[in-house]
Amino acid sequence: MTVDEFDQFVMLPENADRLLEYIGGEVIEVVSNQRASALASRFIGFVQLYLMQNRIGFVTGADGGYMIAGERYIPDGAFVSKTRQTEPSEQAYSAIPPDLVIEVLSPSNTPHEMRVKVVNYLSVGVTVWVADPDRKLVEVYTPGQPVKKVGIGGLLDGGDILPGFAIAVKDIFDV
């Protein structure tokens, strides 16, 4: 299936309630579980609280899609700065990539799919936070830098993207 065929496919009425990604020429249905969903909501909630005090952009949840490097992704959460996009798009998949993506690993994520997504996000300048509930750590992927692993005793900071944002990793996993 081509990306154009995918774009038509997701707009069919029977697909209206499905979360679909286009990765490596394949249609992947996003399937999560309650644990991953709760962690993603909690993680996004911390970013949202920060944004209430620092009105520098907006967050999208697990149904906000993005066009990334010719593919279509639906991250668990994403932050888009006002300098990149002033308000959320009404398109199913925004053509403007986010500044930051939050992914929470769940049993349906294959290591290959996640690697492809991270590489493609990085290729368009997106920072990626991958939360691993089993290992209780967050991997931070920043364009042009080595991966940083922040464990349960560490502090995750927003760097240049979310200046002044900091959260104890243990608080992310304390559900």
What does each model-identified segment do?
Residues 1-175:
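Gly/Pro/Ser/Thr-rich low-complexity, intrinsically disordered segments predominantly at protein N-termini
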